[in-house]
Amino acid sequence: MQVRQDFCLHLIGDGELKEKLQAQVIALKLENHVKFWGKRADVDQLLSLFDVMVMTSKNEGLGVAALEAQAAGLPCVLSTGIPEEADMRLGLCRYIDLNAGFEPWVKAIEEQAELATVSKVVIDQQFEQRGYSLSATRQRYLDAYLRNEKN
């Protein structure tokens, strides 16, 4: 398989593997292709810079980062450890098994990078329908509050 050289991997956040990953990047001479952003408050703005979001988690409770990516219109390649509830059914998500090997992941990333843009209106409507909008969240809190008042 021919591997493209015009890529850049952006890692947002910090964790226990950061130093190990940085050492591996240096050992593989990939410093020009990998950017460590650390913890950021402006993730939503960073997402607009990227072509694809890749999540290789073995297990996620919901996959909030995948929801954030889709809200920004960013195509996603997700491991099967990310629950299907994280897919907003916008045609932006593709699931790959972590054990599938290198080639299926590369192919999926390249294909997702070529997806057509989904309009913000469609994205907002889908988030509203699935209950992930501000108004839906506000209504859930109000309903919970009113239930507690009755008790």
Q: Where in this protein do the model-derived segments appear?
A:
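A conserved nucleotide-sugar
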Residues: 1-35, 151
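Aromatic "clamp/platform" in nucleotide-sugar-dependent glycosyltransferases that forms part
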Residues: 39, 58
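A short alpha->beta transition loop at the rim of the catalytic pocket in nucleotide-sugar-dependent
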Residues: 44, 51, 73
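Short glycine/serine-rich donor-binding loops of glycosyltransferases
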Residues: 63-68
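Short hydrophobic beta-strand element within catalytic cores of glycosyltransferases
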Residues: 75-80, 85
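A charged, aromatic-enriched C-terminal amphipathic alpha-helix characteristic of glycosyltransferases
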Residues: 116-151
